[in-house]
Design a protein with these regions (language model features):
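Non-catalytic, mostly N-terminal accessory regions of nucleic-acid modification and defense proteins
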Residues: 1-206
Length: 206
């Protein structure tokens, strides 16, 4: 059982960071809508880090990275099948959350720079990987509430890229250790966001 004080400390830190993320989107759209973007980014990071963790585990004895295995034409279908069997989806190495963050914060040149369209493609690739598999029922439409082409995120691709990029970087700062976390980050984040936005709506209503 998680230590109560540790849980509370983690929950408080998560609440502060989620509030900061919410402020990035505040004024762009209704609170009930932008929570979908925050939850969508958090969930994508969760799925991505599950992939990272699983691939590191199964490839350890082979002495290759996920990137190296995926780049090999013979190895790629093998790791894709492993991922589908174990996780129910495939996230390509270039679409891993950590690699998208690198393109936002440490891009090497203009061609390497992050675009909101990269994130949109990453999500489409993930959902597409489940087609024809049992897991498609769980993933089909899962990210539909996160409309990355919505003009309220920004009138131009550059504006939307800036907005989503800032949210993603803030989400990357959340303590998200899947092995050591004292509590359910996804579930706790959802409950905190519901509380934050209910409070926000109450203030507007009052």
């Amino acid at each position: 059982m998680a230590d109560t004080n540790t849980y509370q400390a983690q929950a408080n830190e998560l609440s502060q960071k989620l509030w900061a993320i919410a402020n990035e989107l505040r004024g762009q759209m209704d609170a009930s809508e932008f929570k979908n973007y925050i939850l969508g980014v958090i969930f994508y990071r969760y799925l991505s880090e599950r992939t990272d963790m699983y691939m590191a585990e199964i490839l350890e004895n082979d002495g290759v990275t996920y990137e190296e295995a995926f780049a090999d034409d013979d190895y790629r279908p093998v790791v894709e099948n492993w991922s589908l069997s174990k996780l129910g989806y495939v996230i390509k190495p270039e679409n891993l959350f950590r690699n998208l963050i690198r393109k936002i914060t440490k891009f090497e040149n203009d061609a390497d720079k992050f675009s909101v369209e990269d994130f949109e493609k990453a999500i489409n690739d993930l959902v597409g990987s489940t087609m024809g598999h049992e897991s498609n029922k769980a993933f089909d439409g899962l990210f539909n509430d996160m409309r990355l082409q919505d003009a309220r995120l920004g009138e131009t691709v550059a504006d939307r890229t800036d907005m989503i990029g800032r949210v993603m970087v803030r989400v990357s700062d959340i303590d998200f250790d899947l092995q050591d976390s004292q509590f359910d980050v996804l579930g706790t984040a959802y409950m905190i966001l519901i509380g934050l936005f209910a409070s926000d709506a109450g203030k507007k209503g009052g």
